[in-house]
Amino acid sequence: MTGSKDYVVADISLAGWGRKELDIAETEMPGLMACREEFGAKKPLKGARITGSLHMTIQTAVLIETLKALGADIRWASCNIFSTQDHAAAAIAEAGIPVFAVKGESLEQYWDYTDRIFQWADGGLSNMILDDGGDATMYILIGARAEAGEDVLSNPQSEEEEYFYAQVKKRLKASPGFFTKQKAAIRGVTEETTTGVNRLYQLQKKGLLPFPAINVNDSVTKSKFDNKYGCKESLVDGIRRGTDTMMAGKVAVVCGYGDVGKGSSASLKGAGARVKVTEVDPICALQAAMDGFEVVTLEDAAPTADIVITTTGNKDVVTLDHMRSMKDMVIVGNIGHFDNEIQVASLRNLKWTNVKPQVDMITFPDGKRMILLSEGRLLNLGNATGHPSFVMSASFTNQVLAQIELFTKGEQYQNQVYVLPKHLDEKVARLHLDKLGARLTELSGEQAAYIGVTPQGPFKPEHYRY
């Protein structure tokens, strides 16, 4: 591991490799490159001090350098202990941007790195957060509540929370008053994923959201593309790299049929698997059934499944009892944000055999074995390299526009959760059409008037469901 005052990466000598992949990724990320061209001279993020907590991949490196080109100062960590691509982190460190991310870092290191992205060399404070899953945001908010005298650190509910609370206590002791000052300095947060967005909406509902937030996840050009088409390519990639299993003919159970579940089901179906879906929502269940999938309960499907994948963003979706009922050598994995979709903690007293990084074989008392991918964390990033660059360009272009919006116009926003306006969603999509050779048909003035829009758009009302 290579560490200094300004970065911690696995091996700084990987920077050259990372830079080569960055150069390739830029050609697949037209939205971000267009942002550099449009905003680079104006530097709308000059003065922004962005704390970023998002998977430290090659694609994220292109995002980071785009934010830098637009004037921002940045400190970055990964939002998952397994998702870092070490050569990407090295390239960013070599470019002089503080980054703290190592593939396979411990939970203790994870929360230490989350703390370090708020610790600026000049002793100043962050004024923006770019988050994925909400950990950076929650770190500051929980710390501020503890400083205010609330009893929020005494009862951790998981191993993750134990390390989280320990790091908060460490910072409380080292820098009294830090969290309260840091919370007050934040102009806004932009949140990447479903899980983090849910946390923000819960804070808003309770009146505990202390700054404006933009829900990037629910931009159409994020959720309907990254969540669906990204998973469609990266899920099977992760399973194959982790297990080398043949998926054709196998029975795969996908828990959840939201956007991630839809992409995951399509991914497995495309690989030839016989896919079954579990759902709690009757609308999503009906969609799955009419897309040709058998809708089942996990209790019924677990004994015959060869592959079980969770996609829900909920907890305890796959329980110990479910896993006990599964066949020998079943493959179990998760593509939702946190590791608690699968009751991994309940397996810790069993025999674990590490096959290779992020692949473990767990043996039950009756001799049955289970292959667990990435310890129940995001397998597409732990066992593979995540979504392709092109689809991440759409997601990250939304992030750039959201950061500009909150940093430059933050006073126009209340302490609520917002989504980007429709015209920006359409702009993001438009920026990616040329790369695919797609040409838009143009409305005449008469046609536009007939359906109540302008020829330039927006073309759909806010309530339209794509």
UniProtKB/Swiss-Prot annotation:
The keyword Secreted does not apply. PROSITE patterns: ADOHCYASE_1, ADOHCYASE_2. One of its GO terms (cellular component) is cytosol. NAD(+) binds at residues 193-195, 227, 256-261, 279, 314, 335-337, 380. Its EC number is 3.13.2.1. It holds the Pfam family AdoHcyase_NAD. Keywords: Cytoplasm, Hydrolase, NAD, One-carbon metabolism. CDD domains: SAHH. The keyword NAD applies. Gene3D superfamilies: Adenosylhomocysteinase-like, NAD(P)-binding Rossmann-like Domain. Pathway: Amino-acid biosynthesis; L-homocysteine biosynthesis; L-homocysteine from S-adenosyl-L-homocysteine: step 1/1. It comes from the Bacteria. GO terms for molecular function: adenosylhomocysteinase activity. Its cofactor is NAD(+). It catalyses: S-adenosyl-L-homocysteine + H2O = L-homocysteine + adenosine. Binds 1 NAD(+) per subunit. One of its GO terms (biological process) is one-carbon metabolic process. It is an enzyme of class 3 (hydrolase). It is found in: Cytoplasm. Its main location: cytoplasm. Substrate binds at T57, D132, E192, K222, D226. May play a key role in the regulation of the intracellular concentration of adenosylhomocysteine. NCBIfam families: ahcY, PRK05476.2-3. Belongs to the adenosylhomocysteinase family. This is Adenosylhomocysteinase. It comes from Mesorhizobium japonicum (strain LMG 29417 / CECT 9101 / MAFF 303099). The gene is ahcY.
